[in-house]
Amino acid sequence: MARYEKQEKKDFVRKNEQIRVPQVRLIDSDGTMLGVKSVTEALYLAKQQELDLVEISPTAEPPVCKILDYSKYLYEQGKKLKDAKKKTAKTAMKELRIKSRIASHDLEVKIKHIEDFLKRKDMVRLVVVFHGRENQHRDLGEQMLHDVAKRLEPIANVEGGLQVTGNRMSMIFVPKN
């Protein structure tokens, strides 16, 4: 453990007696606006309902506070964060390499792997590698990539077309939505 670790700043939410402004814009537990009230009056209303006074928007003028159950509020905030993380796309780039003289059955197996990756919403780069004299027959590799693209057309789009770099020829497949 490092001696001087930076501590993460958690989103600090002021509640009850931690609110130090003279007046707040108050929202009731059912969401109705009660208007601008003094902090002591807002605290009294919260205690009457056996709930907490939580500062929702500290930058507003006057700050917006809501009467609610603080532990339930924290739970809902955590749930919102988890949902937001789930919605962010986690697409990975998978790469499959094949030789230009691959056997037809081996190519079928590779296509099955590509289909599995695409079903998991991953992007796939299919690379044809040329060795030695195979460089003279690049048209075979190009034809193979186009055949694979036609075969995967119902479930994938080709991104960027055919790319050639050195002794490699590649095509990127992106899953259809």
Swiss-Prot record:
Under the heading SUPFAM superfamilies, the entry gives: Translation initiation factor IF3, C-terminal domain (SSF55200), Translation initiation factor IF3, N-terminal domain (SSF54364)
One Gene Ontology term of the biological-process aspect is: ribosome disassembly
Name the Pfam families on file. Answer: IF3_C (PF00707), IF3_N (PF05198)
Task: List UniProt keywords, sorted A-Z.
Answer: Cytoplasm, Initiation factor, Protein biosynthesis
Name the principal localization, coarsely classed. cytoplasm
Superkingdom is: Bacteria
The keyword Cytoplasm belongs to this UniProt entry's keyword annotation:
yes
Q: Does the keyword Repeat apply?
A: no
Where in or outside the cell is it found? Answer: Cytoplasm
Q: What does the record give as the function of this protein? A: IF-3 binds to the 30S ribosomal subunit and shifts the equilibrium between 70S ribosomes and their 50S and 30S subunits in favor of the free subunits, thus enhancing the availability of 30S subunits on which protein synthesis initiation begins.
Name the UniProt record assigns to this protein: Translation initiation factor IF-3
> From what organism does this protein derive?
Elusimicrobium minutum (strain Pei191)
Q: In the record, what lineage is assigned to the organism producing the protein?
A: Bacteria, Pseudomonadati, Elusimicrobiota, Elusimicrobia, Elusimicrobiales
